[in-house]
Amino acid sequence: MVSDLIGESNICKDDIVIEIGGGRGIITEQLIEICREVYVIEYDFNLYKHLKDKFYNINNIKIIYGDFLEFELPKEYKYKIFSSIPYNITAAILSKLTFADNPPEDIYIV
């Protein structure tokens, strides 16, 4: 199902994608196969450790421990967002992305 969703998106091999909340890495696995670079911001420390262990030998991924709402979005290059985000912070995340100095080219929320 995830590969179908990504396949229907406008994400391609030259893209830089930010994934908000990598969780167990199911979406991440698909993104690293397609994208030039993937940034995963994970708030839960145990899931962060899991992602670091799972993707330790992958060169096109950067896993960041922290709160996406405090994460500084890129200012000088284009990027896309692909994420499955919690309902209770959806409005705050969309507001941050919409009003960013350099908003994302595309936003995919599942």
Which residues does each PLM region occupy?
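Catalytic cores of RNA-modifying enzymes
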Residues: 1-110
